[in-house]
């Protein structure tokens, strides 16, 4: 179809041997099905780097990839939607990718994804709740914005719980051995 600018595929973890890789494999499978569902809302928000196909004329029309964005695969998807293109998901095709093997590597990857997502959200925030841009303005931007707020609140809550637990443990330890 003329208005389809990109097609993305299912991404699977290559050689998932350890627990952290197997957990990511489950995450990637769920994400693939989520993308398929989001296709019906014209809201596929990312065209993952391991394997996405683009129409050359559409990429040229929107100005190509933003090389300064940490998550250019999210940014290009949003830009294509801004220009009224559609992105499709093919569950029939699949690609395998390497994922982090350590918690530290996973943390670095997710930090990069979060910062890039914030870059993209701030770049397109002027479309927030803008009906002219359909699901980009009415669904994706509000969803991403709320998810960032919830993530930050969750981080503070988690930190508060850990701090209280540590403080309680130290207080108990001091009181018990005094």
Please tell me what each predicted stretch does:
Residues 16, 97-98:
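Generic structural signal for helix capping and beta-alpha/helix-loop junctions
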Residues 7-10, 90, 98:
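Structural motif
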Residues 101-178:
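Basic/Trp-rich segment in TM-proximal cytosolic loops or flexible interdomain/linker regions
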Residues 61-62, 98, 106:
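Residues that scaffold the ATP/ADP-binding catalytic core of kinase and kinase-like folds
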Residues 76-77, 106:
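Short, hydrophobic alpha-helical packing/hinge segments within bilobed ligand-binding/sensory domains
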Residues 68, 77-96:
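Catalytic donor-sugar/metal-binding loop of nucleotide-sugar-dependent glycosyltransferases
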Residues 56-57, 74, 93:
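Structural detector for helix-capping/boundary residues
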Residues 2-70, 111-114, 118-122:
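Long helical/loop segments within the catalytic core of UDP-sugar-dependent glycosyltransferases
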